[in-house]
Amino acid sequence: RFTHKYEVKPQFCVINFDDPRHSHRCNPINADFLTDIADAYEAAYVIMIGLNRSWAQKQGDFFVESPVVLLTAIIWFLRIYQNGKYCTFPHAIELLNKKYEEVFTILMARPELENYLSAFVDAWQGGAQEQLQGQIASAKIPLSRIISPALYWVMSGDDFSLDLNNPQAPKILCVGSNPDRQNIYSAALSLYNSRIVKTINRKGKLKCGVVIDELPTIFFKGLDNLIATARSNRVAV
């Protein structure tokens, strides 16, 4: 109805985990989004808190930080391996679920990850197997909830990017959820939301609106900052 008001006609995109046949594909940890290991940490943090909402009140706890750090290392490895060719969330989950001896051998081959993983390697080489397995399980068990062919398919493609208000390629994105699968979908949606918030709240972009329904069902990192600062960047929430 209002497409004539855009200099470039916007693309209409949908994320639908229930029926991937009616969904576009979008990789929320596309290598282009990850310019520093801090970006990988944020992605890992969002997904783990999305799966364990109570962890948001326990930042700094050993068994909260451990899975976040481990997942961060895996995501960053995928980012720097072959220029991010396999940097998708499904690849990260599958790598995490390999034998930990194989995983740490692969990760420690990267000098930039040695210090990041020192606590895990010390436990491994020091014979603290129970502690190490507990650390790894605290990442594996929550993430196992989102091992799904539908989620894997949607989250591993690049039909569109999340810079929705890009003047050269504007997009209208509709993201669907399902209250019956809230514990599964909310974590994945939280990752998309955090990425969108970072990309749209910038100077030089088109006017943009964010409409959120049933907000309490998802962890939306950065929403408070978006509300506080978005007006200057012509973003309405």
Regions found by a protein language model. Give the residues of each.
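P-loop NTPase motor domains
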Residues: 1-236
